[in-house]
């Protein structure tokens, strides 16, 4: 295939703006998928992707299209994940393209994540053109949205394509625009092979399958390839393209997008953003922009039924095969038993993993409150990174603690700005800017501690704005903060699973809230139970669950007072003894409810 006739493009869109449906129409129009095989959201292979309507892993498909100029073109659609947690993956997928379609819902306008991804595309020097989707809706306002795109992003929209993926309107116009506007890939098939690895997943029969975009050179079955970040080498067993099922081809050459199967055992070896080259004729330098992805949010996962521990371990190992950005280590808790401490890229990533464990592996799990990575500077000059309250050293050994801050951009309709500002202030935010994008939409930019965002920020953001807000964030830096460890004690015993790292100013309110919640949840016993919240040795809140009392005098009809007194004294003694040996059984609901207490 002549390199001039290849077009590599991706579709940039916010969740729910119709990206996957548009991809379905392009597949049908070019005859890539017959009507019989058709199913909605063809490229979203996981059930969860279909259900939540989001794309989690990048997918690619090759479309053959005969344009109006009579020439045959190969169009490679690289489908990118659209969510904030997967920004690095998006940036790598975009680097594999020369152009992008910015799909915007004609009834809703520009959203925060669309913006973030468009900026990534423009940074990667992609040719971006605009498609206004859902123009068949009665609420569609194409002219207003065009003006908004020009105002906010600065893209020219006078020749934007008006389309409705659902009705199939405008599909041909989009394909023609791709051929006309997006430049062909630059590359030289005679140079040593150099390819960008932009996704990988595990197949239980063939090992790891990697998706690559060849920049220079060619690759075919039998070649020995090398991954440049770890210098590991493999023999190519199969190479080919997706159309949309996997199809082997004699070779892949510069400018093309396809897959390579080379007996790679672990996804962790095939890292997104790595450069693939030939072992015996390597390229001189790796492609720029590769970085290791580090988990940002941590949470403990414990099976409700302890006999499911082995199943949970196997399930995590299977998920890890497909998702190298996710990490897990075994941990134990006195209250919850054996479980795992898991690291995620962000909140959505965490929810998806939990949901997949419950849905695909039928596990019932308890999740501890999410935490972030703190840096603890010791009085002896040491620096340690910790992920949970139980790892925090005693106060006298800490010089100071630093926590990660993020820069959050929130897009909201202007009726809700007051509520958003109040929420950000409550979460210890520092206001950076408020910008009116249009008379009705506002962008609010805040610096926020990630610790405050991981708990319930997103849910509260959505409820304040009735679901209209969109959030995008990036990591800024670490800053010194007054953080303390808040312990919850029951009859003087610390319950490790409920310990939190929290800002000093909030400890009192949070402690009081937790103990009053616990009081409602712990069933009454035969002895009284003291529930306390403490910072260090100082108790800051207390509630008492009163004892149940058996009427020991029921069988004394009338009779002597000394007899009654003897029975009451005996009961009192018994309760005292019981309190010393009695264990308080905490119901599972108590843990689950406490994790939901608002921060």
From Swiss-Prot:
Cell inner membrane is among the record's keywords? yes
Question: What family is reported?
Answer: Belongs to the TRAFAC class translation factor GTPase superfamily. Classic translation factor GTPase family. LepA subfamily.
Could you tell me the keywords of this UniProt record? Cell inner membrane, Cell membrane, GTP-binding, Hydrolase, Membrane, Nucleotide-binding, Protein biosynthesis
Q: Which GO terms describe its biological process?
A: positive regulation of translation
Kindly give the membrane topology term recorded for this protein.
Answer: Peripheral membrane protein
Family matches, as InterPro entries: EF-4, EFG_III/V, EFG_V-like, EFTu-like_2, G_TR_CS, LepA_C_sf, LepA_CTD, LepA_IV
tr-type G domain ranges (all copies): 4-186
GO cellular component, alphabetical, reads: plasma membrane
Chain residues that bind GTP: 16-21, 133-136
The EC number(s) given in the record are 3.6.5.n1
What task does this protein carry out? Required for accurate and efficient protein synthesis under certain stress conditions. May act as a fidelity factor of the translation reaction, by catalyzing a one-codon backward translocation of tRNAs on improperly translocated ribosomes. Back-translocation proceeds from a post-translocation (POST) complex to a pre-translocation (PRE) complex, thus giving elongation factor G a second chance to translocate the tRNAs correctly. Binds to ribosomes in a GTP-dependent manner.
GO MF, one annotated term: ribosome binding
Q: Localized where? A: Cell inner membrane
Query: What Pfam families does UniProt report for this protein, alphabetically?
Result: EFG_C (PF00679), GTP_EFTU (PF00009), GTP_EFTU_D2 (PF03144), LepA_C (PF06421)
Q: Which gene encodes it?
A: lepA
What disulfide bonds does the UniProt entry report for this chain?
A: none
Catalytic activity reported: GTP + H2O = GDP + phosphate + H(+)
Designated name of the protein: Elongation factor 4
- This chain's source organism reads Citrifermentans bemidjiense (strain ATCC BAA-1014 / DSM 16622 / JCM 12645 / Bem) (Geobacter bemidjiensis)
């Amino acid at each position: 295939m002549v390199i001039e006739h290849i077009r590599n493009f991706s579709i940039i869109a916010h969740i729910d703006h119709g990206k996957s449906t548009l991809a379905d129409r392009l597949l049908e129009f070019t005859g890539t998928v017959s009507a019989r095989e058709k199913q909605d959201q063809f490229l979203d292979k996981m059930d969860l992707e279909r259900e939540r309507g989001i794309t989690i892993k990048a997918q690619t498909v090759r479309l053959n299209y005969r344009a109006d100029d009579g020439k045959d073109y190969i169009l490679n659609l690289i489908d990118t994940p659209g969510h904030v947690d997967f920004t690095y993956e998006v940036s790598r997928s975009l680097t594999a393209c020369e152009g992008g379609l910015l799909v915007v819902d004609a009834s809703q306008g520009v959203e925060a994540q669309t913006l973030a991804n468009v900026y990534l595309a423009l940074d990667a020097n992609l040719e971006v053109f605009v498609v206004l989707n859902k123009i068949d809706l009665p609420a569609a306002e194409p002219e207003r949205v065009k003006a908004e795109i020009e105002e906010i992003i600065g893209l020219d929209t006078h020749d934007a394509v008006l389309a409705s993926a659902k009705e199939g309107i405008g599909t041909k116009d989009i394909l023609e625009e791709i051929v006309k506007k997006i430049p062909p890939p630059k590359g030289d098939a005679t140079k040593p092979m150099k390819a960008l690895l932009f996704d990988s997943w595990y197949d239980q029969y063939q090992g790891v399958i990697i998706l690559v975009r060849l920049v220079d050179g060619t690759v075919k079955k039998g070649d020995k390839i090398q991954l440049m970040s770890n210098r590991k080498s493999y023999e190519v067993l199969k190479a080919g393209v997706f159309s949309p099922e996997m199809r082997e081809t004699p070779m892949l050459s510069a400018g093309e997008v396809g897959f390579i199967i080379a007996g790679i055992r672990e996804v962790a070896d095939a890292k997104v953003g790595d450069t693939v080259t030939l072992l015996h004729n390597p390229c001189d330098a790796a492609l720029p922009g590769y970085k290791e992805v580090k988990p940002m949010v941590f949470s403990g996962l414990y099976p409700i039924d302890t006999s499911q521990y082995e199943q949970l371990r196997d399930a995590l190992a299977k998920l890890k095969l497909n998702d190298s950005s996710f990490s897990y280590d075994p941990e134990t808790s006195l209250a919850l038993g054996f479980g795992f401490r898991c690291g995620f890229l962000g909140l959505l990533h965490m929810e998806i993993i939990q949901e997949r464990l419950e849905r695909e592996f039928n596990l019932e799990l308890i999740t501890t409150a999410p935490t972030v990575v703190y840096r603890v500077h010791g009085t002896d000059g040491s620096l340690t990174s910790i992920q949970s309250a139980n790892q925090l050293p005693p106060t006298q050994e800490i010089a100071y603690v630093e926590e990660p801050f993020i820069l959050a951009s929130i897009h909201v309709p202007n009726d809700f700005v007051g509520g958003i500002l109040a929420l950000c202030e409550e979460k210890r935010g520092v206001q950076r800017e408020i910008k009116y994008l249009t008379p009705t939409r506002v962008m609010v930019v805040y610096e926020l501690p990630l610790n405050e965002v991981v708990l319930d920020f997103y849910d509260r953001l959505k409820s304040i704005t009735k679901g209209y807000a969109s959030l995008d964030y990036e990591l800024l830096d670490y800053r010194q903060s007054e953080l303390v460890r808040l312990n919850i004690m029951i009859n003087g015993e610390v319950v490790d699973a409920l310990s939190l790292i929290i800002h000093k100013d909030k400890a009192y309110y949070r402690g009081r809230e937790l103990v009053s919640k616990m009081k409602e949840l712990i069933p009454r016993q035969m002895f009284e139970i003291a529930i306390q919240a403490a910072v260090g040795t100082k108790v800051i809140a207390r509630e008492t669950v009163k004892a149940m009392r058996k009427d020991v005098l029921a069988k004394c009809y009338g009779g002597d007072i000394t007899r009654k007194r003897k029975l009451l004294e005996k009961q009192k003694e018994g309760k005292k003894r019981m309190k010393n040996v009695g264990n308080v059984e905490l119901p599972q609901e108590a843990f689950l409810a406490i994790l939901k207490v608002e921060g």
